[in-house]
Amino acid sequence: MAENLLPRGDDLAQQENNGFGPLFKRRGRTAAITSAIIGVSSGAMLFLAVKEEEKKTHFLVFTAALLTLSFAFGELLRRLSLVSEEIQHKHTRHQGKWKSVFKTTFTFDHGGCISLTAMFSALILCYQLYEQYEVFSRSDFAILFSVNCLVVPQLLFLVGLRQLSPVETSDLNEKENKNVADGLAWSYYFGYLKLVLPHLKDQIAKSEQFRYKIKKKKLFILLPKTCFTHADIVDADPRVKWAGNLPELKISRGGIKDRIYKHAVHKIEMPRPDGTMDEYHFILEYATSLMTLYDMSQHADAPLSRKERDHQVVLFIRKLREILDKSEECRGSYELVPISGNDPNEIANVLVGMHNAANIEVLAGNHDQANGVIRPE
């Protein structure tokens, strides 16, 4: 007897965004906050454990300052090994400038904070040595400082413990726009969307064929998770048929006089219960930049795994949304439509669903306005 199983949480998550799946957000400050909590709580527990004994308290403070200062100096010495490598590339990477060699090697994101911590540690050491010179001037502490400054940083570097984890690398790339997806999103915006979207409503108004048929005067951009874009959308969903093009938009760009840009209008027919048909017209196209990700995943010289491609397509959508949300020229002229790319009948259903949902929202807003109702944001 077949069992009726409820969908699991993972299955429900994969149904989000028209079957595309969840779109993750930027990483926050949780890791830094957790690290701070661990550091402060550990230091507090150590201090509470020795606070009754003055000698141990002084030892704890002195040792913490000593290790902190030795770590700072050790990092500077470790970076000298990086300088030795950069010297080999001084003329090709740094235009022969020593200043560039040292600047790129010894630059810290939080240099001010590091300097302040090192100075504070040095002051503590000086004070402790002044107060209890006989206790802390032993050679044991000098050896500890030397090992932690000269040996440990180099050892950690050589065995690979200083290598960034995949999480840290991903976070760094996202923050500094170094992902493939970030470059593709910016290129798609500057090379296409920023040029055509500001003129979209004018192009619709110029079209005698479609000016009254197109109800949603936006460019609907299909974003399949598979990254594969069909040459004709009808191949992805037979119900989405090409109906014609809007008037051509001519823009001189990149040395090409009157380069032509044009948008395709697609028609969807959905049957009613009484047998008649509802017609919907959309300005519809794929985000062609996604095909680059698909091609990279298929090319031997540009290895991009399926898992990494799935990651990059989400980054592309997120970055593109961030860019367009901040663009005054493009506001109100686009609709991003993430889809799974696997269902042959999903495009028509998704677009009609978005169209009807928008109409219901407008009708609800008009009804509230007529009755003096103010909905909370």
UniProtKB/Swiss-Prot annotation:
Protein localization: Membrane
UniProt-listed Pfam families: STING_LBD (PF15009), STING_TM (PF23417)
Keyword RNA-binding on entry: no
Keywords of this entry: Immunity, Innate immunity, Membrane, Transmembrane, Transmembrane helix
Gene Ontology cellular-component annotations: autophagosome; endoplasmic reticulum membrane
Gene3D superfamilies per record: 1.20.5.5200, Stimulator of interferon genes protein
Membrane topology according to the record: Multi-pass membrane protein
Gene Ontology biological process terms, A to Z: activation of innate immune response; autophagosome assembly; innate immune response; positive regulation of macroautophagy; positive regulation of type I interferon production; reticulophagy
Transmembrane segments: 30-50, 57-77, 106-126, 141-161
GO molecular function ontology, one term from the record: cyclic-di-GMP binding
Major site of localization recorded for this protein: membrane
InterPro entries, per database record: STING, STING_C_sf, STING_LBD, STING_TM
Similarity comment: family membership: Belongs to the STING family.
Function comment: Facilitator of innate immune signaling that acts as a sensor of second messenger signals produced by cyclic GMP-AMP synthase-like receptors (cGLRs) and promotes the production of type I interferon. Innate immune response is triggered in response to nucleotides from viruses and bacteria delivered to the cytoplasm.
Name listed for the protein in its UniProt record: Stimulator of interferon genes protein 7
Source organism of the structure: Stylophora pistillata
